[in-house]
UniProtKB/Swiss-Prot annotation:
Major location category of this protein: secreted
GO cellular component: chylomicron; extracellular exosome; high-density lipoprotein particle; low-density lipoprotein particle; multivesicular body, internal vesicle; very-low-density lipoprotein particle
Secretion signal span: 1-18
Protein name: Apolipoprotein E
Sequence repeats: 77-98, 99-120, 121-142, 143-164, 165-186, 187-208, 209-226, 227-248
Region (Specificity for association with VLDL): 271-283
Glycoprotein found in the keyword field: yes
Length: 310
């Protein structure tokens, strides 16, 4: 835990971008090239991003499609796919929280919901800005649209920067929470092994101590019975009463041993329960502390957008 947590915080803070940029387009392209799209929602967002970059070229084909509703419809479909995958990822993570306290689970859900909402708002603003540009473009048919395209290009650069920032924020939050879940699960397994190992050894020893006397007594009784039958020349009927008495004696001893085993098993069960109850409470407390540290680290990440260089 002490080793993993600083590494997670360093990874989280490493996502902050520098304020100095060689150029908006070059810097954005360079940053997006490092985007790790391993999750379905990340891949869906990558498709949205690539389509937006194509729109921003404002080529002749883009200009033609902007005059219709094709571009906004395509962006809407890509946005819906992205948000669908984000919700699925969030739901899966919340299921993995399982045994943690409801208060902790609610805090995590609230943090992820806010990050998800910011990402959705960014994509919604991109779509609305292009719809606005479409209306402006239709109103200026036959006139020069150079200035209009310049304003759109500058606005899209800012929106792309904000989209990338919020996407990385959501990605980092999910990664930190997932790493916390894995670390907590591994620590819990190791703790269980440490506690159950001695108990398992004690149970094995108890079984040996109980079964060995029973086996030895049964063998001794069988030898005595065999010797007596041989001496009697197999007149079993004459010694039937004696055999019955010996059988009853062995049965009584077996029942006595079985009762002792039952009592020892009940004591073992009570001891096992006393081990587990504080362990579960400790797991819940440690997980709540882990989530609290994650949230403090995330709040420390700068959220302001660096100023655009004109």
């Amino acid at each position: 835990m002490k080793v993993l947590w600083p590494a997670l915080v360093v990874t989280l803070l490493a996502g902050c971008r520098a304020d100095v940029e060689p150029g908006p387009e070059v810097q954005l392209g360079k940053e997006w090239a490092t985007w790790q799209a391993s999750q379905p929602w990340e891949q869906a967002l990558g498709r949205f991003w690539n389509y937006l970059r194509w729109v921003q070229t404002l080529s002749e084909q883009v200009q033609e499609e902007l005059l219709s509703s094709q571009v906004t419809e395509e962006l809407t479909a890509l946005m819906d796919d992205t948000m669908k995958e984000v919700k699925a990822c969030k739901s899966e993570l919340e299921e993995q929280l399982g045994p943690v306290a409801e208060e902790t689970k609610a805090r995590v859900s609230k943090e992820l919901q806010a990050a998800q909402a910011r990402l959705g708002a960014d994509m919604e603003e991109v779509r609305n800005r292009l719809a606005q540009y479409r209306g402006e473009l239709q109103a200026m048919v036959g006139q020069s649209t150079e200035e209009l395209r310049g304003r759109l290009n500058a606005h899209l650069r800012k929106l792309r920067k904000r989209l990338l920032r919020d996407a990385e924020d959501l990605q980092q939050r999910l990664a930190v929470y997932q790493a916390g879940i894995r670390e907590g699960a591994e620590r819990s397994v190791n703790t269980l092994r440490e506690h159950l190992g001695p108990l398992a050894e004690q149970a094995a020893t108890m079984h040996t101590l109980v079964s060995k006397p029973l086996q030895e007594r049964a063998e001794a009784w069988a030898q005595r019975l065999r010797g007596r039958l041989e001496k009697a020349g197999f007149p079993v009927g004459d010694r039937l009463d004696e055999v019955r008495e010996q059988v009853q004696e062995v049965r009584a001893k077996v029942e006595e041993q079985a009762n002792q085993v039952r009592l020892q098993a009940e004591a073992f069960q009570g001891r096992l329960k006393s081990w587990f109850e504080p362990l579960v409470q400790d797991m819940q407390q440690k997980w709540a502390e882990l989530v609290e540290k994650v949230q403090l680290a995330l709040r420390a990440v700068p959220t302001s957008v660096p100023s655009e260089k004109q």
